[in-house]
């Protein structure tokens, strides 16, 4: 029987031609032995654990933050009360990403934007307000610091506050991010340290956590940020593992941490779950397969506690539309379904108002409810890897892994992941895909309900964008003045000098950063040290 009876070829987002149906003969020969494995067994594509979500439901892990630290604190408590099982702090992007204080001219010029995309946190005092009353000792928390140069400040502030409250860092659960895909590919900032110092920072964080915070995930490579920039699912996989190789090779070169422990530290990653939910489920399966193969073949690591990839997933914010925004609840549910079918360990669902603003309280609540309905009402948690054995799913899983390895090798021919960022090669690949997707939408090949088909002349459900608070800049300005006026200036000066000295040497910067937090050194002062010592990245993007 002819498998593609029509003349028109159909392709997945990764450019894989899809058949109208699949049979056993379509499954690649090398993949057949993998199908015989059980969930929780190498090569792990079938799932992290044999009992799956029966024994451990995925973590409901929503990004949250806006306005003042107390606003973010209130929203996190609201989400925890509504059933969130972990929390993610978001720092203000205007100040945090650039390591600016609010009195920096670039921030003052955009004062109305301060606090729109996270809470303003310039010193340890702000972090203390933001985490007041939060169960940081028992709940898995994300301390913020998604951008590389901001991560040491965000992490050290969180850890120092925890210490001051009597919590043992050796038992503190949580994660950092410090993501290269966000920093140098997805959201390139005006002033950012170059990629080599950025690699050094992440290696420093990994080594510091190995010594003092064994339950903390030091860095989390975010395929999400590469995908929302334009990379296809296979490219998202390839770029994530190319990034991981840079980290592991650097840790191996430095020789301060056992490579098996370093691999475990790098084995908590995040992906985007987009609307093509079967392909996304296959992507998660392929990711576990690739990580297992990468560690075994390149580094000789087969320890199941290390070779079994841990995955956080966020639904694609870029797929949410401002037209007919309530449709986005359906989109979010389907994207979440793909992530869960793929066996992720934690999940965040983008708000239905994503295209308009940061999430309102109601949008945030609905993101939690979507996950709770999936967990409690659908029976999806009853069986591990429910798609396993499907001719289509197994074939597509193998094809995605194969294409992803091809992209991985393309990156290596560019000189590696960092070189591909520095040259702009990765940016070009993302831009090409963005243009193709735009043209597919323009000519109707890619349908988006409410946008290029089935539009409404009048929207029956108006959704106002959530504007946060209007006093974030003014309050942050007064708090900055208060810190500078009342801190122990000699201690702050000494700590800042030590940080600069360590930045200029090959000394791990994190002990000095911890001292700087205790001495109430501010974010902008730390950023000034970075700019003086490292300069700024020579971005390949022309604006």
Over which residues does each language-model region extend?
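Phosphate/diphosphate-binding loops
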Residues: 122, 150, 162-164, 187-209, ...
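Catalytic alpha/beta active-site cores
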Residues: 1-280, 298, 305-312, 340, ...
